[in-house]
Amino acid sequence: VFKTTAIIMKIHLNFEKMNVWRKVAVPFNITFSDLHRIIQYLFSWKNCHMHDIEIVDNDKTAVRFVISEEDMEYYSDESILLESQSKIADYIPKYKKLIYTYDFGDNWQHIVEIENLQLDYDKNYAVCLDGEGNSPPEDVGGEYGYYDFLDIIKNPSHEEYKETKAWASSQYWHE
């Protein structure tokens, strides 16, 4: 029987006014690239934009993981590693907080808090354990664009309702 260790993490979209979060178990031996794909799936993102992952220690970036060597040029004063070559197990449980930022234009910050380790995990894939709230659609304009979007979607008499509803459907967004 397959047994491994899992990391139990809670991932919140960093919103001021809403709770959007997922609790997930992930195998201990995954890379930060794998974590990126897991978060994309959990929040219904389409992997259309750049991203990075920071390990945070005492509210400072300890290490930043990026997609490619070209991305390293933007952060010359930090410890930068390639996410595809870096395993989570090398950093957890020493560090308890990560920040996953997706789409630098909309700036979706996901706060990843490490809750605990599960020693008898019997899967080689991630499992969503719990969650709350709908994820925003791609390219909605960040947090405040999402609030505007929700106001329009809730008001069928709004002049932009039909257009916004059609756009939401094209983004596979659901209420």
Regions found by a protein language model. Give the residues of each.
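Short linear regulatory motifs enriched in tryptophan with gly/pro/ser
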Residues: 1-175
